[in-house]
């Protein structure tokens, strides 16, 4: 089977930074999964004794706590500080940016609108820095909001720029004063553009990444638009040889939290089909 990779894929700057931080802080715990890739989380625990705490109470039992790439809520951060925990901040700088924007705009009296998934830890963290905050998943939800005169818009870092642009355009037409902040990560945009391009060419697409990863699911969604035979897998063990019957070119991309060692194993298995 012939394999072709997307021009941009895999580990982004924020994830690489977080992995380095975790590897330098053995015996610490992360408050929530450091990244959305269970295999890499297992590697960090096995090789560096970096454990995973899923609750604030659990994290407080450790002397050192690593803040996940997606960030945590303002209240949770304050609790850790008051507990005199050694806090190691691995929040992606691209996530810190909308946190700061939301806090500043709220202080200036703006209603905050976040384009994102309300259950995602990044969005929960960003929203915690504002007072009057509405979270919308799509443009239809915006149409049903009661809007104030002054509104500021930010986005979850992994959303599709095209959808954000449409929301921004509608919002401008609805309010007297609107501040728009494009907080979508540049790596997200580049990876999405690359998978869009490759999926138009490939007979089959394999997207490698955590199934709980927002950016990976976005890549899968885009690939599926142009290549109906698209599959989202976490590692090589999920590959089904029957997918490739009658196919000539397999396109591969990977989410921002997918390490190279997993991608290489996937490539090797597909090339042997």
Swiss-Prot record:
Keywords: 4Fe-4S, Iron, Iron-sulfur, Isoprene biosynthesis, Metal-binding, Oxidoreductase. Binds 1 [4Fe-4S] cluster per subunit. Dimethylallyl diphosphate binds at residues 36, 70, 120, 213-215, 257. Isopentenyl diphosphate binds at residues 36, 70, 120, 213-215, 257. InterPro entries: LytB/IspH (IPR003451). Its EC number is 1.17.7.4. Pathway: Isoprenoid biosynthesis; dimethylallyl diphosphate biosynthesis; dimethylallyl diphosphate from (2E)-4-hydroxy-3-methylbutenyl diphosphate: step 1/1; Isoprenoid biosynthesis; isopentenyl diphosphate biosynthesis via DXP pathway; isopentenyl diphosphate from 1-deoxy-D-xylulose 5-phosphate: step 6/6. It is an enzyme of class 1 (oxidoreductase). GO terms for molecular function: 4 iron, 4 sulfur cluster binding; 4-hydroxy-3-methylbut-2-enyl diphosphate reductase activity; metal ion binding. (2E)-4-hydroxy-3-methylbut-2-enyl diphosphate binds at residues 36, 70, 120, 157, 213-215, 257. It catalyses: isopentenyl diphosphate + 2 oxidized [2Fe-2S]-[ferredoxin] + H2O = (2E)-4-hydroxy-3-methylbut-2-enyl diphosphate + 2 reduced [2Fe-2S]-[ferredoxin] + 2 H(+); dimethylallyl diphosphate + 2 oxidized [2Fe-2S]-[ferredoxin] + H2O = (2E)-4-hydroxy-3-methylbut-2-enyl diphosphate + 2 reduced [2Fe-2S]-[ferredoxin] + 2 H(+). [4Fe-4S] cluster binds at residues 12, 92, 185. Its cofactor is [4Fe-4S] cluster. The active site is at residue 122. Disulfide bonds: none annotated. GO terms for biological process: dimethylallyl diphosphate biosynthetic process; isopentenyl diphosphate biosynthetic process, methylerythritol 4-phosphate pathway; terpenoid biosynthetic process. It holds the Pfam family LYTB. The keyword Oxidoreductase applies. Belongs to the IspH family. NCBIfam families: ispH_lytB (TIGR00216), PRK01045.1-1 (NF002187). This is 4-hydroxy-3-methylbut-2-enyl diphosphate reductase. It comes from Helicobacter hepaticus (strain ATCC 51449 / 3B1).
